Regions:
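Catalytic alpha/beta active-site cores
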Residues: 1-178
């Protein structure tokens, strides 16, 4: 029986057929709407360009830079660096991002909440020192504000205020960073 063997019954109470025919989609609004146009049923992007991102754990900035430059030649166009406090210095930032076109490659950083402000300032200063057009440079600063509370059972005082401050300083230094 088709319904018994092939139709998936979801927990939300609707059935999903394994295939659809033209008459199944005749009255759907999605067939007339275009991607990137109101009412955004098919998303806000009008193109299908995706970033190919590679995460790199930074134990040694020179090794991480070498790995980053190597994978950039293989089609990657977004890098994610996991950075510890010891590596957040102007010298290390210069070594980490050496020979990387930061205006055209998305650069993302992961660190802990204690080091986020220092990382934002160091990155902003480095971009300024090499005359990067910050309206073109894209990326993000990422940290988990609840990690300390969940892992150690200790509250991080004023984490919401600090998060707002970090977002403000990052948006001033690097407007296209999230």
């Amino acid at each position: 029986d088709f319904n018994k063997k092939l139709v998936w019954r979801t927990n939300e109470g609707f059935n999903v057929k394994p295939m659809y025919r033209a008459e199944d989609t005749e009255n759907l609004k999605t067939t007339d709407s275009r991607p990137g146009e109101y009412p955004y049923i098919r998303g806000t992007k009008s193109d299908n360009n995706w970033l190919i991102r590679q995460e790199i754990i930074v134990d040694d900035v020179t090794v991480a830079n070498k790995k980053a430059n190597d994978i950039l030649t293989k089609g990657v166009n977004s890098l994610g660096f996991h950075v510890e406090e010891a590596h957040i210095t102007p010298e290390n930032m210069a070594a980490l991002l050496k020979d990387i076109d930061v205006e055209n490659i998305e650069i993302n950083f992961h660190t802990c909440i204690k080091n986020a402000a220092k990382l934002i300032e160091t990155t902003g200063a480095y971009y300024k020192s090499i005359h990067v057009d910050t309206t073109k440079a894209k990326g993000s600063f990422n940290y988990d504000p609840f990690k300390r509370m969940l892992k150690r059972g200790r509250d991080f005082a004023n984490y919401a205020t600090q998060a707002a401050s970090l977002i403000k300083s990052a948006s001033e230094l690097l407007p296209k960073f999230r």
